[in-house]
Amino acid sequence: MAVQESAAQLSMTLKVQEYPTLKVPYETLNKRFRAAQKNIDRETSHVTMVVAELEKTLSSCPAVDSVVSLLDGVVEKLSVLKRKAVESIQAEDESAKLCKRRIEHLKEHSSDQPAAASMWKRKRMDRMMVEHLLRCGYYNTAVKLARQSGIEDLVNIEMFLTAKEVEESLERRETATCLAWCHDNKSRLRKMKSCLEFSLRIQEFIELVRQNKRLDAVRHARKHFSQAEGSQLDEVRQVMGMLAFPPDTHISPYKDLLDPARWRMLIQQFRYDNYRLHQLGNSSVFTLTLQAGLSAIKTPQCYKEDGSSKSPDCPVCSRSLNKLAQPLPMAHCANSRLVCKISGDVMNENNPPMMLPNGYVYGYNSLLSIRQDDKVVCPRTKEVFHFSQAEKVYIM
């Protein structure tokens, strides 16, 4: 029963931690499947049209040259259809193989061989670090770590490198790359009710006004804002008011609209939509796992001002992690455990807690080990007491 519960807990842990490992390649496979379907349907319709034209021509006793020309057109369309089909199938096959490779890797966690299990855990740690580095913008370091650990097929480097290109273009105050990304994911973004493309068009309008190209700005508004409604219509009305003010105006809200910091907001909006598109959280799995681990062992003793109760073996008590764990909740403990300050052993019926006259509690076995001439010295206050003065503590 205990083994089954442990296996179930491990399975649940994998589902939580490894969700991005399978979800991202699955979404890529799904996207390529839909793109292939559209391409093949489009090319098939082209073939159908030229075949229909050929049949219509043949019904009226045409000249040989015209028939040959139409046949060449049919052959050309069939060649294009074949090429598009082969390319689409190859792309789908690559995505399917990637999904299979990652599934096989996740199955290795249940290996009975200690060495194999240890290697799998090491790879999982490297995968978490690669994803965290990619999220933080350390792309070269992440790629080197993935290559060194042999986990390039197990991490989502391609997705983050694509995002890197988009973010860098926005940092250069260019919208073309991000708009192309929006076009590639148009159907999914529409289902998500994303406003990223609209925000980009608004920014393009603002830049035209900044450059004093007001006539171009009006044309841009007619082209892209004619279908705006609801809150978007209110935003359009606001930016249209910029036409009445100079680019260096200090009047709000037009001054805020002209603030270059809006480009940073667009980067954040793209990043948010990109994570939603691939159903990823805003924090890396490494961050979430670290926070969960710190919270599981965090106690009030880790934050005593005098530092007397801090343990050198406790990660939360360490200087590097103590501040990081500060906003996290304390560990949930249904049953308290008393740990001896001297030995670090749990105090229980085999090592009952004993209280000295000064109020400090230690394990019975520890007091026996430091007793000299029937006297014990309190490690904290250096006070000396007779061993018989220690009283047994009972916890209700």
Swiss-Prot record:
Residue span(s) of domain CTLH: 159-216
Gene responsible for this protein: Maea
Residues modified to Phosphothreonine: T28
Annotated SUPFAM superfamilies: RING/U-box
Zn finger intervals (RING-Gid-type): 314-381
GO process annotations (BP): cell adhesion; cell division; cytoskeleton organization; enucleate erythrocyte development; erythrocyte development; erythrocyte maturation; negative regulation of myeloid cell apoptotic process; proteasome-mediated ubiquitin-dependent protein catabolic process
Entry's transmembrane regions: none
Tagged with keyword Ubl conjugation: yes
Site positions for Essential for ubiquitin ligase activity: C314
GO cellular component assignments: actin cytoskeleton; actomyosin contractile ring; cytoplasm; cytoskeleton; GID complex; nuclear matrix; nucleoplasm; nucleus
Major subcellular location class: cytoplasm
GO molecular function: actin binding; ubiquitin protein ligase activity; zinc ion binding
Species whose genome carries this gene: Rattus norvegicus (Rat)
Assembly notes: Identified in the CTLH complex that contains GID4, RANBP9 and/or RANBP10, MKLN1, MAEA, RMND5A (or alternatively its paralog RMND5B), GID8, ARMC8, WDR26 and YPEL5. Within this complex, MAEA, RMND5A (or alternatively its paralog RMND5B), GID8, WDR26, and RANBP9 and/or RANBP10 form the catalytic core, while GID4, MKLN1, ARMC8 and YPEL5 have ancillary roles. Interacts with F-actin.
Extracellular and involved in cell to cell contact: region residues: 1-124
Disulfide bond annotation, renumbered to this chain: none
Broadest EC class assigned to this enzyme: transferase
The protein's Enzyme Commission number: 2.3.2.27
Name of this protein: E3 ubiquitin-protein transferase MAEA
CDD domains reported in the protein's UniProt record: RING-Ubox_Emp
Location of the LisH domain: 121-153
Localization per record: Cytoplasm; Nucleus, Nucleoplasm; Nucleus matrix; Cell membrane
Comment block on domains: The expected RING-type zinc finger domain is highly divergent and most of the expected Cys residues are not conserved. Still, the protein is required for CTLH complex E3 ubiquitin-protein transferase activity. In addition, the conserved Cys-314 in this highly divergent region is required for ubiquitination by the yeast GID complex, suggesting a direct role in catalyzing ubiquitination.
